[in-house]
Design a protein with these regions (language model features):
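Domain-level signature for soluble enzymes in the chorismate/prephenate branch of the shikimate pathway
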Residues: 1-298
Length: 301
């Protein structure tokens, strides 16, 4: 005889049962995470770091190695990142500085690393991100350090030299630039707002489609979207999420010149991270001679 025919109500009932089990397991995990905090406090270390990036990296690698599908590894990692973020928030609310305002790629990187339970603190500049971490106003900071098209981010490199902070992790984020505007056609555009790195990553597209528009560098792509929202003849280069935040339409999608455009972000902290088993060492080196063309920065990772 053939296989029994599944009925929709039976499948939904089974889903409800699985959801109930998931909820019970999530509660059990949260209680275990709380126990970890209690053990650390019992050891007499009131300043214990509840967030351990090396431990989180180990957990995510293990989960992905066990994943048999049908969810892909990226989806599974995202789910468990959010679970860990929510559990951590029960013990130690996390404040994370990033280059703001809302709607930047730095914000996206922060969410990918720390999840939605963390309190994200927007900063006006990369230098301010470093100052916030150094002063202890936030637990961690996120800063872009290198782009596959434009190379190193000089503001981050300079700040790494100026501050005694540790790199505790990294996030590689695929960068897709959208052209956002109140204008209805490219012919109406007179100004293009964007971070200097983003303007460079879209240089050839802008040359071909907006050759006469003024290119205006701004502190972040989120700030560019905010400025474009106040004008009728301006566009901003920004991520898709900024279109929703600032109520702009997408005039053109994925305008980056390189299809595999990727930016590497670093997680900044005041304490060294432990070994995770898949670690990198980063160095920033500057020569004593400061003449143009003589400054040298090298990183090995």
């Amino acid at each position: 005889s053939g296989q029994p025919v599944l009925r929709l109500e039976d499948v939904r009932r089974h889903i409800d049962q699985v959801d109930q089990k998931l909820l019970a397991l999530l509660s059990e995990r949260a209680n275990l995470a709380h126990s970890v905090g209690e053990i650390k406090r019992a050891e007499g270390n009131e300043d214990a770091q509840f967030y351990r990036p090396e431990r989180e990296a180990q957990v995510l690698r293990r989960i992905q190695s066990l994943n048999a599908g049908p969810l892909d590894d990226a989806s599974v990692a995202w789910l468990f990142r959010e679970i860990m973020s929510a559990c951590l928030a029960l013990e130690q609310p996390m404040r994370v500085a990033y280059l703001g305002p809302a709607g930047t790629f730095s914000q996206m990187a922060a969410l990918r690393q720390f999840g939605h339970a963390a309190e994200l603190v927007p900063c006006l500049s990369i230098a301010e991100v470093f100052r916030m971490v150094t002063s202890g106003s936030v637990s961690y900071g996120i800063a872009p350090v290198e782009n596959s098209t434009e190379g190193g981010v000089s503001q981050t490199q300079e700040a790494l030299l100026a501050h005694d902070l540790s790199i505790c992790g990294e996030i590689a984020l695929r960068i897709h630039h959208q052209l956002l505007s109140n204008a209805s056609a490219l012919g109406e555009v007179r100004r293009v707002y964007g971070h200097a790195q983003s303007l460079g990553q879209c240089r050839h597209w802008l040359d071909a489609h907006l050759p006469h528009a003024e290119r205006v560098p701004v502190s972040s792509n989120g700030e560019g979207a905010r400025l474009a929202a106040e004008a009728e003849d301006a566009v901003a280069i920004a991520p898709e999420v900024a279109a929703q935040l600032y109520q702009l339409q997408i005039l053109a999608a994925n305008i980056e010149d390189e299809a595999h455009n990727t930016t590497r972000f670093v997680v900044l902290g005041s304490q060294d991270a432990g070994a995770s088993g898949a670690d990198k060492t980063s160095l920033v080196v500057r020569s004593e001679e400061r003449r143009v063309g003589k400054e040298c920065r090298s990183r090995w990772a």
